[in-house]
Amino acid sequence: VMMPCVPPWKSEWVPRGNAPSGYRSHIALCKAADETYLVGWVDYEPGYAPNVQAELEANRDNFVNGMQAQLLTTTNTTWQGFPALEFTARRGDTHDITSRVVMKATRPYQLAVLTPAGQHRSANIDRFMASQRLK
């Protein structure tokens, strides 16, 4: 993924309730001027068999809720042959959010861009989103 800066990476183990199982999340945030770029993915424990559509929707919903945003659009699609969900959201009256979640095997990958609300930034968003490569 091409980002306008070299972001620090954060990885953390997230347990599932009181169970010993869980997942490891990996996130990088890049702030460039008044735009924020996010790349993330999750590694689940061995043997986890997700319902792909439910996983895509849960990633979207958790992200939108975590950002305290309102979902505006959502589209089921594919990215490089893998199931994907693209969506937009609005965070209050300050930020527009454009995001894609792609499911490759048991690993969901997410890209997101936050831009000032109502400003036309499609060139930056499109360049970032198009740079995603899944091996």
Predicted segments with their positions:
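Acidic-enriched, low-complexity/disordered segments with a strong bias for Aspartate over Glutamate
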Residues: D34, D43, E55, D61, ...
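Surface-exposed amphipathic alpha-helical segments
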Residues: V1-S11, E55-L71, T106-K135
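Solvent-exposed coil/turn segments that connect beta secondary-structure elements
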Residues: V42-Y44, G92, T106, P116-A117
